[in-house]
Amino acid sequence: MLNSKVTEEMKGHPDYWCDHIGKALNICQTIGSERMKILFDLYHVQIMDGDLIRHYQQCREFVGHIHTAGNPGRAELDDQQEINYPPIMRAIAESGYTGFVGHEFIPRAADKVATLADAVRLCDV
């Protein structure tokens, strides 16, 4: 699984292979194995490249798992962040994706379970 994370010090690892989603896609296409997949991290792709739906559609056949988080700050999914999850999740569902979506955010609220439940509801399109 190729992880689409950035190379900035606080957001990834120096010299990481897949600092842009296009690199992860190129590696998967070059390797040509059903066992090589992309961990499509919506938070990181938004920071690196933006245009989440288009980038997802370009590499959907290679996506093995999806992560969410609010941007900025990797906070919970709410109306205080820039990623509008319902249309993104609809596009992912309409593409035929049947895999898991992992919510990988850092909740600010005291009730962490309620925050997770809110994220699940927001993404359950």
What are these regions (language model features)?
Residues 5-16:
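Surface-exposed cleft-lining segments at the edges of enzyme active sites
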Residues 1-4, 102:
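Short beta-strand segments at enzyme active-site cores
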Residues 18-125:
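Histidine-acidic metal/acid-base catalytic patches
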Residues 3-6, 35:
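Asparagine-centered polar/low-complexity signal
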